[in-house]
């Protein structure tokens, strides 16, 4: 039939476990032969599927130094950052709640710089130099940590992390009990 097209769905890549080596090691620069447009689609598809506001390639098992994030959550505007690099941190810090797709249900109060300057390459390979503030800066730094082989659990004390893990376990148990009651 004319006018009809078959659209091949993009498969959803599974999230890797936080203990996977790909999440612990700093990532090298992006591969020269990387298909940036295809990776952009893959990241957006996975980020939307998992209902995240940011997603690094290594979270779905792709060993490339790249992440995608919402630059404006309300407008659903995204940016994709290849080979990101923070060039200067501001002195002011702010504490905000953070969660992570690879740590479901875990929320931590994390202190980070409120402002910074960074460089990254866009999907077309163009250098972007920007300043980020507020929530946009928070998301960028969180995803940047993944590129560096670390995560938000390393930014709080062991005591606070253990308390948050207990809270998350209690919430999961409560959630399971409420499902069983139905």
Task: Give the residues covered by each predicted segment.
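Positively charged
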Residues: 1-182
